[in-house]
Amino acid sequence: MFNKIFCAILSLSLCSGMLTGCTKSNKTGSIQSNPAQVEPVQIEEPQIPYSNHISANKEKLDAAVDQINKDYGVMGSSIAVWEHDTIVYSHSYGTASLRKTQYINEITGEVTTADTTPANCGTKYRVASISKMVTAMLAMQLQEQGRLSLETDIAALVNEKLQNPYYPNDKATIEMMMTHTSGIIDGAGYTSAINKQPFPALDVVLQRNNFSGLKPGSSYSYSNFGMGLVAGAIENVTGEPFCDYAKNALFEPLGIDASFVTDYIKDRNSIATFGSEDPLSWGNMKEIYGQIPVGQMYLLGHGNLFISAEDLARIGIILSGDGIYQGKCYLKKETLDNIHSPRVYDYKTNVTRGLAVQITSDIIEGVTLYGHQGNAYGAISCIFYDPSTQRGVVFLTNGASAKRAESQIYAVNDAIVKQIWQYL
């Protein structure tokens, strides 16, 4: 009788999972099938096997990561570690901002001014190329909805001048943009454009050469321009400015204070500076980028995400698990498998790449990690996770050494992930 009830419950659970499109999988254990040892059914919270280990050693771990920060000249940083759907460790170090900030005592009304702001769990960092991973998530949501195909020709969707002049009969697809194999590179037109304000229209950028001369899909060449154009593709199929679509489709549903433009950050004083470089001095970013017509975006999506370590960890929970966070499905499991499927090998950094995701087995012996690194304005950052255990690490900085480890991962990222993983 018990077995019939158990099977009925299991069948109902499986059907419910298939109807939602996102399914929760048990990756931490196996079902024991000896009926003689079956106990009455009890619903328990998922076990977190290592969080107590981290809690018991938090002071030791804090001291170890602080020393790594010192060794690599980190200005300010924040770390968030998760398992399954829970953030189990967070820690911040150093200075987040050199911006003068006024503080008002809520009780006395006294106003004080501070020349620096220490980093904390709410500090928002510009995460540079980690942004590409989030842009790809947004594109893959649209792919699930049938609104965007990975096989779509970027020239047909965004701008006909993106047709490769060396291979006029070969299309450069959205998938090629995500794998850096499109033949569209950070050429003279692009590098000139990003150093100007107001930013020129895409037509102007394309007046100068931005093609590698290699057949689309045949060769790897890291391209910020290509991932920026994915933002333009998203605008074309949604009819919304990229920063608005990201806010409506991902950040607000997640309940996180993040954006590709600083204007949308609720607590703008929480945005980290890069030494003396202050993102708040860049002006009204929404207005500046808004001068580029909707559907012609070629910036933002490649590297302009501002987010805290804990909020990026929440996105990591989606990517490392079953696409679900707090009961809401953001990506289907088969989509995550597609994202994580190896496409190309980057010999310069010794990293295999999926869809806007880096894949490496050279940080932790015997563990394949997925994620991305960021490097801009002197800030080095990373997110790496293991889908097989649903564990991951976010490490964000506003300034650090760009030295590389033997693995070719940035040395500070390599050291932090190794240190954290000892407790996982």
What are these regions (language model features)?
Residues 62-65, 85, 126-154, 230-235, ...:
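Active-site SXXK
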Residues 97, 104-108, 166-376:
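Short, surface-exposed loop or secondary-structure junction motifs
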Residues 54, 400-424:
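Short, gly/Ser/Thr-rich active-site loops of penicillin-recognizing serine hydrolases
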Residues 54-125:
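Short, conserved catalytic-motif segment at the N-terminal edge
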Residues 380-384, 389-400:
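Short, well-ordered beta-strand elements
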